[in-house]
From Swiss-Prot:
It is found in: Membrane. Partially overlaps ALT2. Disruption phenotypes caused by deletion of this gene may also be a result of a defect in its overlapping gene. One of its GO terms (cellular component) is membrane. It is a multi-pass membrane protein. Keywords: Membrane, Transmembrane, Transmembrane helix. Signal peptide: none annotated. This is Putative uncharacterized membrane protein IRC2. The keyword Membrane applies. Disruption phenotype: Displays increased levels of spontaneous RAD52 foci in proliferating diploid cells. The chain crosses the membrane at residues 21-43, 58-80. The gene is IRC2.
Length: 102
């Protein structure tokens, strides 16, 4: 089971799959590299894969590049969405990510 969060043009969509659904619906594109190659030309935006069972919430953070959608996992580990076009990770101070969990 995993969560897929895609942000495109300021709108974020979340998709949550259990093991049975993902194996039937995503057969053939399960590898992250293959799936990224499929998503990139369509959404031209952000992609993140999270393990199941982790608490997470998304928020927008401003960077010198543009606004990036990031994810806080378990309110203890800061993990940002990878930008498929710009090939960089958005970041924020750990204290800032901690305050968002309070």
């Amino acid at each position: 089971m995993f969560a897929l969060i895609i942000s495109s043009k300021g709108k974020t969509s979340g998709f949550f799959f259990n093991s049975s659904f993902s194996s039937s619906a995503l057969v053939g594109i399960a590898p992250l590299t293959a799936y990224s190659a499929l998503v990139t030309p369509v959404f031209k935006s952000f992609l993140v894969i999270l393990p199941a069972g982790l608490k997470s919430k998304s928020f927008a953070v401003n960077t010198p590049f543009k606004s990036c959608w990031c994810v806080i996992v378990m309110c203890s580990y800061f993990f940002c969405v990878y930008h498929l076009q710009k090939q960089h990770y958005c970041g924020a101070p750990s204290l800032y990510s901690y305050l968002l969990c309070l």
